[in-house]
Amino acid sequence: MAPVLSKDVADIESILALNPRTQSRATLRSTLAKKLDKKHWKRNPDKNCFNCEKLENNFDDIKHTTLGERGALREAMRCLKCADAPCQKSCPTNLDIKSFITSISNKNYYGAAKMIFSDNPLGLTCGMVCPTSDLCVGGCNLYATEEGPINIGGLQQYATEVFKAMNIPQIRNPSLPPPEKMPEAYSAKIALLGAGPASISCASFLARLGYNDITIFEKQEYVGGISTSEIPQFRLPYDVVNFEIELMKDLGVKIICGKSLSVNDITLSTLKEEGYKAAFIGIGLPEPKKDHIFQGLTQDQGFYTSKDFLPLVAKSSKAGMCACHSPLLSIRGTVIVLGAGDTAFDCATSALRCGARRVFIVFRKGFVNIRAVPEEVELAREEKCEFLPFLSPRKVIVKGGRIVAMQFVRTEQDETGKWNEDGDQIACLKADVVISAFGSVLSDPKVKEALSPIKFNRWDLPEVDPETMQTSEPWVFAGGDVVGIANTTVEAVNDGKQASWYIHRYIQSQYGASVSAKPELPLFYTPIDLVDISVEMAALKFTNPFGLASATPTTSSSMIRRAFEAGWAFALTKTFSLDKDIVTNVSPRIIRGTTSGPMYGPGQSSFLNIELISEKTAAYWCQSVTELKADFPDNIVIASIMCSYNRNDWMELSRKAEASGADALELNLSCPHGMGERGMGLACGQDPELVRNICRWVRQAVRIPFFAKLTPNVTDIVSIARAAKEGGANGVTATNTVSGLMGLKADGTPWPAVGREKRTTYGGVSGTAIRPIALRAVTTIARALPEFPILATGGIDSAESGLQFLHGGASVLQVCSAIQNQDFTIIQDYCTGLKALLYLKSIEELQDWDGQSPATKSHQKGKPVPCIAELVGKKLPSFGPYLEKCKKIIAEEKLRLKKENVTVLPLERNHFIPKKPIPSVKDVIGKALQYLGTYGELNNTEQVVAVIDEEMCINCGKCYMTCNDSGYQAIQFDPETHLPTVTDTCTGCTLCLSVCPIIDCIKMVSRTTPYEPKRGLPLAVNPVS
């Protein structure tokens, strides 16, 4: 009996065991069985913790906000990039959050980092530790939606971490003269006391302004202030602090350690005697607040203040902080942490990593009065710290020279809001260690004396003007904790930033110079910003390759003016005609596309329009061109014109446009709707003969360059481009919109629907949805007509996508839909993005990057995955019993590492230097053409197969399902672990990679065995006749 070919064989049936099937009946399974099922597949922590995760010596990142590239891109795309963004108003350093998230969504991580560091020199630190829920995130407009606010801190951290990996130095503002040619005032000696966030920020901005004799004095042998000594490694790694300090040192700032503010060392008086013209005090609050009940208690007895405890933990957990290796502080038994601020929660979670069995966080007020940010509170709760509110410490009980317990009294709030202690309600809590985290003060008399003669306020802190950060001594400024205004790292950074401008103003005044009334601090610069992205085309010089397409962004000339002011290099006017062909538009006429699915807001992948050409007259546009060229001589203005197939009309209109001063013309031969019915636009652009003749007419009429705008709504676009070239065109624009019908509602009516009759017509589809069509048009023209200029348009929404068109043979790039999604300011992102892409091509150490995307390392939730397979010989999924086993293995490994005596060398930062010439825009034009050809030129003997990274796999089975129902049934799916395995029947089709939700979890690698296609039945052998 012949086999049944249309039935799966037994081996395939086995593979298909877990493949989805349509449901035909209800499913029955007992509650007990479901409880067991739930336990097996559970990924989040069990609320009944009988055997909590062991965290001793585990200083791995625990932040919920941390993102990998996938998470960062999705979150950035979700951001609305609002007008007058409230998030920015809530950021102490005034970060342009809208702009840096725009850059992240466009995979321009350098552009994002540049925006961040321009306003915050400690942008990576703040991305990690900022209490964003109380700052920028608190103002996010998406709080008004179901999905909630944007993870701004995580995005900030991701972008700046990618820049950190680029290993590129900060440079002086390129517009400044060399240091030796700067005015004398910029050589003034400036001293900063304390190497914490406020001083690093202040010194960075002063150096960016051009000052070249800046010294920071730090009393410790390490730098970074509390970022180094008190914020734990699992929240803020030391290499991050060191990186930002190195960026500051790139500008020539000097740091001298082991020098303290004290009558026995440095004083304001000695600084003045040594010739310092200005000083900044950023020493923080170095002494702990200590309740009288702790007098006489020592660390040997089990008592620590946060100022004792956290630095001890830091020295043993922060690699590179100091050359010596300090063993991790060992704590056993029960720990009581007193306080409800961020520091108290840092102490609690750090105590667990020092070996504490249980940690109680005890505070005087209730949960609603906890001062710590929600992020810290949630982390402590997840790590099973216990919270005890409404208790005030009364007494420490010591036996045998060790703390054994603490006595508390109950606190209550009366009707007036005053908190009182109730001595009748006493609680006693057994404990082995007590950590007091009641805050910090400035109490050392030697330090205060060293600050003489500045005045102190009623809180015994230096008195400063909160606007200028100036003390009672005009040459002395202060910021950060020591002033008592800043409560967070980011606020301390802003104090230093604020002070830098007024130090600048003060110093300049001492040298008889003045500064602008409005503060103007320089941006952050690197060698990337020096990359030249200008390009020449048809004897026209473009400052960058990005311009406005003849479309909605050029509805009026005033809009073009604003675009030029923003940085766009060129613009095409909205297409205009002779007055006899003037149009009136219908409405509605521009709608969102359906190609993005149910995604609302910006980031649309397509738009459809049934808008005609400009409703404004030729006279308006000609005068506008004249005005724009007068005010923006370095910008290119291209007049976009349209006529019917009439020689006289084309010659008349093109001469008018040339006379207006336009640099070039674009002949719109491609409008896909409306105009074609008038014998214009598409009606002219689909016939090579008509195109050739129109171009000949225009060539006879004008001397300036002109370009024919082509339609993609043809069978052979090359024949149209060739006709334009033969007619004398200097190049072509490829392509205009694709004719389409975007959608029909459930009742059958279209959208857009015009008038009472709800009628519509086929419109022009634009946006990233048509990019494949536009790329094909550009590359086919470039291959057929080498060196023939192409103005690309069609889905260009980033520097990365723009580079694709340049590689495809385009010379300059026109943008429309991306502006409809956002605004004119995206040009800043495009320029920095293209500069970065070109610069990184010259760095040999980054050749495994894809543009600005680093090579993907195995990770889960954006955090590195421990190599479990190396420890136990096999890979395990991250859920249920396997996750618990992973945690146990990691805990054992951390304990093993704790016992090793590891010597850590100081961190060194050696910048990546370009080993190859940085390519120009001209150098990359057409680079991809060598890879394009016919199907017959492809090699079918060099095959690939899929390989799945099981450590990154999230076990969704998408690869398995698409392979089953759309491919070759070549992936097995384990019923217990849900780990997919690619079999040797893989054909390398790449569908699995295409639907995988995790970047680089699946990779295609070269096949090592010969590929033998499955023919179903053997090939018939026909005899030779």
UniProtKB/Swiss-Prot annotation:
Residues that bear N6-acetyllysine: 384
Residue positions binding FAD: 129, 194-198, 218-226, 235, 261, 480-489
InterPro entries in alphabetical order: 4Fe4S_Fe-S-bd (IPR017896), 4Fe4S_Fe_S_CS (IPR017900), Aldolase_TIM (IPR013785), Dihydroorotate_DH_cat (IPR005720), DPD_II (IPR028261), FAD/NAD-bd_sf (IPR036188), FAD/NAD-binding_dom (IPR023753), Helical_ferredxn (IPR009051)
Family, as annotated: Belongs to the dihydropyrimidine dehydrogenase family.
GO cellular component: cytoplasm; cytosol
Protein name per UniProt: Dihydropyrimidine dehydrogenase [NADP(+)]
Function field: Involved in pyrimidine base degradation. Catalyzes the reduction of uracil and thymine. Also involved the degradation of the chemotherapeutic drug 5-fluorouracil.
Main location: cytoplasm
Organism, as annotated: Bos taurus
